[in-house]
Regions:
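Alpha-helical transmembrane segments of multipass membrane proteins
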Residues: 43-47, 78-79, 106-110, 128-129, ...
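Generic transmembrane alpha-helix motif of multi-pass integral membrane proteins
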Residues: 103-114, 121-141
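Residue-level micro-sites within transmembrane alpha helices that shape
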Residues: 29-36, 100, 122, 129, ...
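Short regulatory/linker helices and ligand/cofactor-binding micro-motifs at input modules
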Residues: 21, 28, 212-219
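Alpha-helical transmembrane segments and their interfaces in multipass membrane proteins
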Residues: 44-70, 87-94, 116, 133-199
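N-terminal juxtamembrane segment and adjoining first transmembrane helix
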Residues: 1-93
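Membrane-embedded alpha-helical segments of multi-pass membrane proteins
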Residues: 70-72, 99-104, 118-126, 181-185
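Juxtamembrane or sensor-core-proximal signal-transducing alpha helices
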Residues: 13, 79-83, 181-216
Length: 219
């Protein structure tokens, strides 16, 4: 009797893990394709800005630093693509690629001037990519690393780029505290929504499994 009662839940659990394994791999492929397209689009925008004004802020060392990060990021995306098309997808790979994305975003934001750059919005794009791998732990990792990356940018801006003495004595260069708090809270809320996507996907798979077992029982 106990085995009969436990069978639907056990089958649903197996169905979820099997579906997640396949769909997480497919999701990683989609994320990597979007990653490559996004790198090309953002770097293309940078090159257009550079062509319009060669002596502007987009030139010089800024251009060299951005190009170095883009080459490293694109190279990593190429390696990831080769691994995925060969169906090599170890469990830790999704965490490695997420941390890589957050690191590259943090570097680009630091090069662009710290937490005031609009590229901070890329953290939210990275968080929303996590549900495609169907892992709650990855959603938590993405949210946490985005917040850490933003805090690192704040520290870099205050203590290195501007200098703490100038920062705290000059209101014009400060990042408003309300902006800092709202950005971090928005990251947390984005992570919560991303987590709900994964939970709903699991409920859907388990419900289908239960319905299939019920239909088999009726037959």
């Amino acid at each position: 009797m106990t085995d009969t009662l436990n069978r639907p839940d056990a089958n649903a659990n197996v169905a979820w893990h099997l579906s997640r394994r396949i769909e997480a791999w497919a999701g990683e492929i989609r994320v990597n394709v979007i990653r490559i397209v996004a790198i090309a689009l953002f770097y293309g925008r940078h090159l257009i800005e550079l062509l319009i004004d060669r002596h502007g802020a987009a030139g010089g060392m800024y251009h060299l630093r951005v190009t170095a990060v883009i080459i490293a990021w694109a190279g990593a995306a190429g390696v990831i693509h080769l691994l995925l098309v060969r169906r090599h997808y170890p469990p830790m790979m999704k965490f490695a690629t997420m941390i890589l994305d957050m690191l590259m975003i943090t570097l680009l934001c630091a090069i662009a001037g710290g937490p005031k750059t609009p590229m901070v919005l890329l953290y939210f794009a990275a968080i929303t990519s996590a549900p495609l791998r169907l892992s709650l732990k990855l959603v938590w990792t993405a949210t946490a690393t985005a917040i850490v990356g933003y805090l690192v940018l704040l520290g870099y801006y205050v203590w290195y780029l501007v200098g703490s003495r100038i920062y705290f004595s000059t209101p014009e260069v400060r990042v408003p505290r309300s902006q800092e708090i709202i950005t971090i809270l928005a990251m947390l809320v984005t992570g919560l929504f991303a987590g709900q996507v994964v939970r709903q996907a699991r409920r859907m798979v388990e419900r289908v499994s239960h319905l299939s077992i019920a239909q088999e029982g009726q037959a």
